């Protein structure tokens, strides 16, 4: 039975905007607010783990104790134990969210191709709000940090932040044409950077002034507000909605069909190669990002909350500078070569950071990475252009799974490697990340060169 509102005449009528925003503004506030909450929560959660685990083992250290040991080459054994415990608990907590979220995203993405994008944008916002509520409960009751896993489990069931990313990028793919898609995707990623920069600056000062509780209340409120924004202000982008069951194996089939059905122009091979490139890029990005705070907290940098906030702001500023650079270089270069320039920027910055022993050198490394985030919009856009309109949700859910797997690899590899290499080179994980980035740089360059060869052969035949 079809309700009156679902009749073709009513469904095709233009619907008025439900909020006072320009028509060109769609899901940008969703990704901005969600990233703001995540960027505010992330460094504070790491610092809370440090403080709680320090108290549990009786380390009254403050991190400046290890920094003031007569210029000693390394921190004391207690501080190294705290670093190791913090890195390991970060691994356990992130692992819990990934394992649950992997199956949720594989269901929700293809489901959104049928029922629309709005439900899969609201659900993870609510899940992230509940996660913040669990974190608040742990802090109020001073429970063991292992209870953070409950919050990550709840967030994972609802799709987590990766589902918000997938939903927003699929939405932009729905409403943009092929020519403007790369830049529209880059705008979304710039929203990630601006939100992260603002949250990082606020978070450091706020924690220093009032502790952890009040910032996490803001995280809770922002996630709830984002869900309300989606409900009242985001118009549906899927043109032909139809009812569909959520829990069915067909969604998994749609997911895997992308990589098993051979399309035109070696589509399957290119999807696999671009996904592999994205896997490595995001693994290095997440792995380095997870360690930045821990690297800055400990000897020899020994940053306080203010400097950590400025460092995180500098890291997120790369999203904005990469957007400007992408727009500029697109005027004279193909997207693939713009991505190659992003790799050069990222690799050089990570090498400098791996050797940083003073604050100016650390910020120099951040500065060299000014164009580092130009690679991911190019890869997302190329992936989106390879599939049909009705496959965007399945595609970006696969991208979300790749990013979730990247997060798992990043936390497993980098968080385990960091304590294992403390005794000979603290910055070794960043150096390893720079080397790993040579793999996607080679993949993207090779595909671009191979795609140009037929064009040259056609010219030679004509001549």
Swiss-Prot record:
SUPFAM superfamilies: MFS general substrate transporter
Disulfide bonding pattern of the chain: 67-302
Keyword terms of this UniProt record: Cell membrane, Cytoplasm, Disulfide bond, Endosome, Folate-binding, Glycoprotein, Membrane, Symport, Transmembrane, Transmembrane helix, Transport
Membrane topology, from the record: Multi-pass membrane protein
Cellular compartments annotated: Cell membrane; Apical cell membrane; Basolateral cell membrane; Endosome membrane
Keyword Nucleotide-binding: no
Cytoplasmic side of membrane: 1-27, 113-116, 159-181, 232-270, 330-335, 381-392, 446-463
GO terms, molecular function: folic acid binding; methotrexate transmembrane transporter activity; symporter activity; transmembrane transporter activity
Stretches assigned to the Extracellular side: 47-86, 140-144, 208-212, 294-306, 356-359, 419-426
Lineage: superkingdom: Eukaryota
One Gene Ontology cellular component: basolateral plasma membrane
Transmembrane spans: 28-46, 87-112, 117-139, 145-158, 182-207, 213-231, 271-293, 307-329, 336-355, 360-380, 393-418, 427-445
Biological process, per Gene Ontology: transmembrane transport
Carbohydrate-modified residues: 60, 70
Known role: Proton-coupled folate symporter that mediates folate absorption using an H(+) gradient as a driving force. Involved in the intestinal absorption of folates at the brush-border membrane of the proximal jejunum, and the transport from blood to cerebrospinal fluid across the choroid plexus. Functions at acidic pH via alternate outward- and inward-open conformation states. Protonation of residues in the outward open state primes the protein for transport.
Family statement: Belongs to the major facilitator superfamily. SLC46A family.
Subunit annotation: Monomer.
Protein's name in the database: Proton-coupled folate transporter
């Amino acid at each position: 039975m079809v309700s009156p509102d679902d009749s073709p005449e009513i469904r095709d009528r233009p619907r008025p905007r439900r909020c006072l925003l320009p028509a060109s503004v769609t899901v940008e506030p969703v990704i901005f607010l969600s990233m703001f909450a995540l960027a505010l929560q992330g460094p504070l959660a790491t610092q809370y783990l440090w403080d709680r685990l320090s108290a549990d083992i009786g380390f009254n250290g403050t991190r400046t104790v290890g920094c003031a040991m007569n210029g000693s080459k390394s921190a004391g054994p207690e501080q190294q134990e705290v670093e190791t415990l913090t890195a390991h608990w970060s691994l356990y907590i992130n692992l819990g969210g990934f394992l649950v979220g992997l199956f949720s995203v594989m269901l929700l993405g293809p489901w959104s191709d049928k029922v629309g994008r709005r439900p899969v944008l609201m659900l993870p916002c609510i899940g992230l709000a509940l996660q913040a509520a669990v974190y608040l409960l742990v802090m109020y009751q001073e429970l063991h940090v292992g209870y953070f896993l409950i919050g990550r489990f709840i967030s994972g069931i609802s799709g987590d932040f990766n589902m918000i990313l997938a939903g927003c990028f699929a939405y932009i793919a729905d409403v943009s044409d092929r020519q403007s898609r790369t830049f529209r995707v880059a705008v979304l990623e710039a929203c990630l950077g601006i939100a992260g920069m603002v949250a990082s600056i606020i978070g450091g000062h706020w924690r220093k002034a009032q502790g952890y509780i009040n910032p996490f209340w803001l995280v809770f409120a922002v996630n709830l507000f984002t869900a309300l924004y989606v409900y009242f202000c985001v118009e549906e982008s899927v043109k032909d909605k139809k009812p569909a069951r959520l829990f069915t194996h067909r969604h998994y089939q749609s997911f895997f069909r992308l990589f098993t059905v051979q399309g035109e122009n070696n589509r399957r091979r290119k999807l696999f190669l671009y996904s592999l490139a994205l896997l490595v890029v995001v693994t290095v990005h997440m792995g380095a990002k997870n360690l930045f705070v821990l690297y800055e907290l400990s000897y020899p940098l020994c940053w306080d909350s203010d400097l950590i906030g400025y460092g995180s702001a500098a890291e997120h500023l790369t999203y904005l500078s990469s957007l400007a650079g992408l727009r500029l270089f697109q005027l004279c270069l193909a997207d693939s070569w713009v991505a190659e320039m992003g790799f050069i920027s990222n690799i050089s910055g990570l090498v400098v950071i791996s050797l940083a022993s003073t604050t100016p050198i650390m910020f120099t490394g951040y500065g060299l990475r000014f164009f580092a985030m130009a690679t991911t919009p190019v890869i997302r856009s190329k992936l989106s252009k390879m599939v049909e309109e009705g496959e965007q949700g399945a595609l970006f859910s696969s991208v979300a799974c790749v990013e979730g797997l990247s997060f798992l690899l990043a936390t497993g590899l980098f968080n385990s490697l960091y304590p294992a290499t403390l005794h000979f080179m603290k910055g070794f994980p960043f150096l390893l990340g720079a080397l790993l980035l040579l793999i996607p740089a080679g993949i993207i360059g090779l595909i671009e060169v191979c795609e140009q060869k037929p064009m040259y052969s056609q010219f030679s035949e004509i001549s």
